[in-house]
Amino acid sequence: MMSRSENDISVERTESSEIRFKSKKKDPPPETSESIRRRRLIILSFWVVIVTIGLPIWWSTTAIYRAKLPLNQMTDWANGKVCRPVFPLRISIQADSLSVHDARNLVRTTQHALDDLNDFPAHHLRLQLHPSNHSVTADEFSTGDAQEVALVIRLIPSAEIKASLHPHLSVLDIYYTSKQVPVSYSSSSPLTTYITNQLRALFSEERTLISHLLSTSNIEQSTEYRTSDTIQKWTSHRMKYSPSYHLTFSLFTPTSTPTTWPIASALETYIHPLLELLHPISDFSIDTQIQFYASPGVSVPILRKEDLSLFVNAAEWPLSPSIGGGPTINFIIFVGDMEVDGGAKSWLIPQWGGVVILPPSEIEDLEPAMLIFAKQLLSLLGAPETGSLPFRLQTLSRVLSASLLLKASSTLGSLARLSLALPSIAIPRSVADGVTKSITSLHAACEGLGGLKGLQHARSAEREAEKAFFEKSMVGQVYFPDEHKIAVYLPLLGPIGVPLTVGAIKELRAWIKRKTWTL
C-alpha cells in the first residue's frame, strides 16, 4: 500500500516536471545591428516615398486652382467709383443765313439757356457752330467716337417759325423770321427760346431712359429720379439685350390658302436695310414659315383688348421659343377679316413679337405689314418712339452703351462677391483673363460713351463679364461636401496609414529606449 503511493507520487513529479519543461519559453536571439538598421531603412523608405512623391501628387491633383482676380477694381466698378457715365452730345448749328457774329451770339445764348435748364449733368448738350457752306452728310453722324455730331440744326429763314426733323438724317430744320434773331447786346431771344425748347423735347426721352438706368445702379446722382409712363412702357415692352436675335416671320391661315406669299422680296426691301442699320447693336438671323389650318386662340370678329393675349395659339402653332444662342422675336401675319376693337389690325406683344391681321385679298402686298413689323422691332429693342429713324437709332445706341456698361460693372461686382463668399470655388485662368478683358473694355467704353466705338467696347465688356461669371468649371467642387471627401480617403488611410504610423511610433520608442540604456 505504501509502495504504491510512492510510485504514484513519483509519476506525478515526473509529469509535472515534463509539463514545466514544456511550458518554458525559449528567448529569441538578440537582433543584430544590421537587422535593426534594415528595418529602420524600410520604414523610412516608405515615409520618404509618401512625403516626397505621394503627398505632392495628391496635393497637385486635388488642390483647387484659384486664379488671382483684381477684386478691388471689380468692386470699384460695381460701386460706380471708376466711371460716372456722361454723354456730352454735340449739337452743330448751321446758320449760313446769319452773319458770323450773329451766329456765334445765337450759339452762346442758346448754350446758356440749356445749361440753366439742365438738371441732369450726365446728359449734357454742347452746341457748336457748323462750318459755313458745308453740306450735311450721313458720314458726320457715324465717325464712331464720342466726338461725333448727335444732331445738326439747320436755320432756314421763313415767314413763320416751325421745326421739322429730317426723315433720313439726324437733322432738325428750324424755320425762323428775321425778328427772332438775337441782337448782340441781348442775352436771350425768341429764337433762342424756341431752339432750347425743341432740343429739350427732342432729347427728353433719352434723358429719361439714361436717368432710369443710373438710378437702378450704384452710381450716386445729384438729382432725384421719378418714374414715368415712358419708363414703365419701355421696361415692360423691350426684350432683354442679347448680342444676337433670331427673327421668325410666320404666315398663319385657317384654310389651305394661300400657298405662297412674297416674303423674300418684302424682307429684302423693308427688313434687311433696317437690320444693316442695327448691325452695330446686335446680329440678326431670319427664317420664315407657312402654317395651314391654323386656328387662333380667340375666334371673334372684333378682338377686345383682353383677347389680344389669347389670340396666339401657342399650344398648336409651331412657334419655337428660341433658335440658336439668341432669343427669338416672332412676327405673325394671320389671314383673316377680324380686327381689334377700335379698327386696328395689328398689336405688339411685349417681349415676344408682333401680330398683323391681313385680309386674304391683301396678302400679295406685304408693305404695310413689314412697316409695322419694323416699327415693332425697334420698340422691342428699346428704341424711343419719337423722332426719325437715324435719330432713334443713335438714341438707342447711347442708351444701350450705358445699359451694357452698368450691367458689365454689376456682373464684375457679383463675381468678386462670389469668389470671396465661396473660398472653395475654383477660378480658372480663363475667368481671370475674361475679367481683365472686361475691365479694359470698360475703360474704353467709359471714354467713348456717346459714339459707336463706345457701344462696341460696352458690348465686349458685357460679353466677357458674363462669360467669366457663368464659367461652368467654377462650380464643379462647390457641391462636393467634406463628408464625401472623408469617404474617399478612409479606404486609403486605414489599410496603409495605420500600419505605417504604428510602425514608425514603435521604432521611435525602441530607439529612445536604446538611447536610454546606453546612457
Please report, for each region that a protein language model flagged, where it lies by residue.
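Extended, non-transmembrane interaction/recognition domains
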Residues: K162-G413
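A positional/structural detector of protein chain ends, strongest at the extreme C-terminus
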Residues: M1-R4, W517-L519
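Long, solvent-exposed N-terminal ectodomains/accessory regions
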Residues: S3-S282
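C-terminal single-pass membrane-anchor helix
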Residues: E483-T518
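Context-gated lysine
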Residues: K22-K26, K68, K81, K162, ...
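Membrane-proximal extracellular juxtamembrane segment immediately upstream
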Residues: T395-I486, G494
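Intrinsically disordered, low-complexity regulatory segments enriched
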Residues: A63-I64, V82, S322, W352, ...
